[in-house]
Design a protein with these regions (language model features):
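C-terminal nucleotide
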Residues: 2-9, 13, 20-21, 28, ...
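Glycine/serine-rich anion-binding loops at beta->alpha junctions
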Residues: 7, 78-100, 129, 262-274
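Short, solvent-exposed polar/charged micro-motifs at secondary-structure junctions
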Residues: 15-17, 82-86, 155
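Short strand-loop junctions, especially beta-strand C-caps/beta-turns
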Residues: 17, 50, 77-81
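Glycine- and acidic-rich phosphate- and metal-coordinating loops
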Residues: 67-84, 112-119
Length: 274
């Protein structure tokens, strides 16, 4: 029986997480850690050699539902920590969509894989933008809702929000990612910010300000101005902290990093990586 393998990278967010859910701009870069999966046809659902209940794996279930499949034999490995803000679930969805499509002899078109992966992410989390899956499928750097973007990859619309996703060419820079060891669930944190923004004008202003900071940061990133970009990343972290998605451990990491860097911020939904 033929086994098909695929892998996809994780990501980190340079600027704009949470605000991007509401259509504000954001920038993310793929990283050199990946989720890898192997799939083959099966009459029962098997994960890493053990028969399992597919309802416990909503991301996987939704991708299989898209293709009208009840079960597969799935094995996986990853050096992306789960719940660390590095897009592990997006990498899972992207790699699984690619592998299943290849197994079925379907097109490996990047946009089709991205749309399947985003549908699975949204199904599992109930909220969110296509930022993570776009970075995972496309690789390199991606921007969302950037003005005057030249290299449009795809446009995604969902529940009144629209995201134009483009390729960006980031100059050579070094980013260091730290991890608190805490696991944070994306869905509840994004929903927490949504409720806060819907009920509080101040929170809406903070989300708008994150969008402004991100636009300023795009200019700094494009010109390779590390000093300005670092300052704006730190400002972005302060705004995210006001929204309530940071934690003492993250704040200590940011404070420590700021002494020896151009700037620092949390990445992803919060409460995990910086």
């Amino acid at each position: 029986m033929k086994t098909v393998s695929a892998s996809a990278p994780g990501k980190f967010v340079v600027l704009g997480e949470h605000a991007v859910v509401f259509g504000k701009p954001a920038v993310a870069l793929a990283i050199d850690r990946r989720f890898r999966c192997n799939v083959s046809e099966s009459d029962v659902f098997i994960v890493n050699g053990e028969e399992d209940d597919i309802d416990k794996h909503p991301h996987v279930k939704h991708i299989l539902d898209i293709h009208g499949i009840d079960a597969i034999n799935l094995s996986s490995e990853s050096n992306l920590p789960s719940g660390a803000g590095l897009g592990s679930s997006a990498a899972l969805c992207a790699s699984l969509s690619c592998a299943v499509r290849h197994m079925l002899g379907k097109s490996l078109d990047s946009e089709e894989i991205m749309r399947e992966a985003y549908a699975a992410e949204y199904y599992a989390q109930g909220i969110g933008s296509p930022m993570d899956v776009s970075a995972s499928v496309h690789g390199g750097g991606i921007g969302l809702n950037l003005p005057d973007a030249d290299e449009l990859l795809w446009t995604v619309e969902n529940r009144g929000q629209k995201w134009d996703v483009c390729d960006i060419h980031a100059p050579e820079m070094t980013f260091v990612i730290g991890y608190t060891g805490k696991r944070a669930l994306t869905g509840p944190l994004v929903e927490k910010v949504r409720r806060y923004r819907d009920r509080n004008r101040f929170a809406k202003d903070i989300v708008d300000e994150i969008g402004t900071v991100t636009l300023e940061g795009i200019g700094a990133l494009n010109t390779g101005n590390k000093t300005e970009l670092g300052k704006l990343m730190t400002e972005n972290h302060k705004l995210l902290s006001i929204l309530g998605v940071s934690c003492p451990e993250l704040n200590r990491l940011v404070d420590a990093a700021n002494e020896y860097s151009y700037g620092a911020k949390l990445t992803g939904a919060g409460e995990a990586a910086v």
